[in-house]
């Protein structure tokens, strides 16, 4: 019983925090359902209330740690009555007595740790123990509000968009208005090649011809006879044959010209301009002239078809020229072009690209014009700031003169009026 009476523990009464009064927002959030959630405007209040609860819990934790330390020290120095007396005095609030300590004998058992010597003063060991118990009157720590750096970050991100326009930015806009060098490449339509089935068939045919010519050459070498055709390239022979067939190919009516060329000639040449053969006199031919002309107009020559070279190229050139002059519509194209889905899609995308490029160019011109106007306005605003400084200087001079109880001079008044008029004129230019 005596040991329990001498126990230095203070047995603090921990008062719980009233959540309804101290933390109303925290209590309301706990009472909600999970679907309601927490609003953004409630975060600051919740943070302050949670910090209040944290400070209360940390204060109770410090008190419990102090009680544990007191119990440990009391167990280690159970025989020291001086320490127990000072602890009881501290509980009652009595100030410790400073003076020469009395000598005491050790009363502890052998099992405990050694205490201080019998004739040794204990004032040095007493003072730290008294400081350990001074925690009841500590004020509640006010939670420190964290620094809110969000506005600074926001204005730092917005600043480049609100800054003044520089000459380098105007120069960049002027360079963007220059047309790119490869702009014409995007509107070119590549020529339509052969269909893959025709190309593959022709390649297979040429490959077979080469194999046949190679086999024939090997056979002729074995026989010792090399034909004249094996020395020629089969590919060149095919090209020459196709060219000759194309040149000598005649339509059914025997006219080498195309339909467009015939229509053009019919539109330009009048009818019945040549007299009939019956009305024209037939001159008498004699001698060599008659022989030569007769040879030229022999029945054999009349049966020979009339041939004109390059009729196909003439037809295509006439068609292109008529389309360029506006006499022929460009829709009169072969049906294969209108049925080509790739070509139609390519032209559609080229039209979209052309419209988008024109729109971007217009917007760039507008942006360049606005940038130049803003640069001139920036110069006017700079002049306004300089005029404001001059007006403030004149105002300070006049106020200093009034404080000294003297009338401002005529020079100071004239200077003030002059700066005010200059400022008004600059503001009119800026508003205009």
Curated annotation (Swiss-Prot):
Biased composition annotated in UniProt, kind: Polar residues: 295-305
GO process annotations (BP): chromatin organization; mitotic cell cycle; negative regulation of transcription by RNA polymerase II; positive regulation of DNA-templated transcription; positive regulation of gene expression; regulation of cell cycle; regulation of cell division; regulation of DNA-templated transcription
Compartment list: Nucleus
One MF term in the entry's GO annotations: transcription coactivator activity
Purpose of the protein: Functions as a component of the PCAF complex. The PCAF complex is capable of efficiently acetylating histones in a nucleosomal context. The PCAF complex could be considered as the human version of the yeast SAGA complex. Also known as a coactivator for p53/TP53-dependent transcriptional activation. Component of the ATAC complex, a complex with histone acetyltransferase activity on histones H3 and H4.
Database matches in InterPro entries: Histone_AcTrfase_su3 (IPR019340)
Chain spans, region Disordered: 87-127, 272-319
Organism superkingdom: Eukaryota
Any one of the GO CC terms: mitotic spindle
Residue positions where N6-acetyllysine is found in the record: 418
Family in the record: Belongs to the NGG1 family.
Sites of the Glycyl lysine isopeptide (Lys-Gly) (interchain with G-Cter in SUMO2) crosslink: 21, 129
Keywords from the UniProt entry: Acetylation, Coiled coil, Isopeptide bond, Nucleus, Phosphoprotein, Transcription, Transcription regulation, Ubl conjugation
UniProt source species: Rattus norvegicus
This protein's name: Transcriptional adapter 3
Originating gene: Tada3
Residue numbers of Phosphoserine PTMs: 280, 298
Pfam families xref list: Ada3
């Amino acid at each position: 019983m005596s040991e329990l009476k001498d126990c230095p523990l203070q047995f603090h009464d921990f008062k719980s925090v009233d959540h309804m009064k101290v933390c109303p927002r925290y209590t309301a959030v706990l009472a909600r359902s999970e679907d309601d959630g927490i609003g953004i405007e409630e975060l600051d209040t919740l943070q302050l209330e949670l910090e209040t609860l944290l400070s209360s819990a940390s204060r109770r934790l410090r008190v419990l740690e102090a009680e544990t330390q007191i119990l440990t020290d009391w167990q280690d120095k159970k025989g020291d009555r001086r320490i127990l007396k000072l602890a009881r005095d501290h509980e009652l609030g009595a100030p410790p007595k400073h003076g020469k300590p009395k000598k005491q004998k050790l009363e502890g058992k052998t099992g405990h740790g050694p205490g201080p010597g019998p004739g040794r003063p204990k004032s040095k060991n007493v003072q730290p123990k008294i400081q350990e118990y001074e925690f009841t009157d500590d004020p509640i720590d006010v939670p420190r509000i964290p620094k809110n750096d969000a506005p600074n970050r926001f204005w730092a991100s917005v600043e480049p968009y609100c800054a003044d326009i520089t000459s380098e930015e105007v120069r960049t806009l002027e360079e963007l208005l220059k047309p790119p060098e490869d702009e014409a490449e995007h509107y070119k339509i590549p020529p339509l090649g052969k269909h893959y089935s025709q190309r593959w068939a022709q390649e297979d045919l040429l490959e077979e011809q080469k194999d046949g010519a190679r086999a024939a050459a090997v056979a002729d070498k074995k026989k010792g006879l090399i034909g004249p055709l094996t020395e020629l390239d089969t590919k060149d022979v095919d090209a020459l044959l196709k060219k000759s067939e194309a040149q000598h190919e005649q339509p059914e009516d025997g006219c080498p010209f195309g339909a467009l060329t015939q229509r053009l000639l019919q539109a330009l040449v009048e009818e019945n301009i040549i007299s009939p053969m019956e009305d024209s006199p037939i001159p008498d031919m004699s001698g060599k002239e008659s022989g030569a002309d007769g040879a030229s107009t022999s029945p054999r020559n009349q049966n020979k078809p009339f041939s004109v070279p390059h009729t196909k190229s003439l037809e295509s050139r006439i068609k292109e020229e008529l389309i360029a002059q506006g006499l022929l519509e460009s829709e009169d194209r072969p049906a294969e072009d209108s049925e080509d889905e790739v070509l139609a899609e390519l032209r559609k995308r080229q039209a979209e690209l052309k419209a988008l490029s024109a729109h971007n160019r217009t917007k760039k011109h507008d942006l360049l014009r606005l940038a130049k106007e803003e640069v001139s306005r920036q110069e006017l605003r700079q002049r306004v700031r300089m005029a404001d400084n001059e007006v403030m200087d004149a105002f300070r001079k006049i106020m200093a003169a009034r404080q000294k109880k003297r009338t401002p001079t005529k020079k100071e008044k004239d200077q003030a009026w002059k700066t005010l008029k200059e400022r008004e004129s600059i503001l009119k230019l800026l508003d205009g």
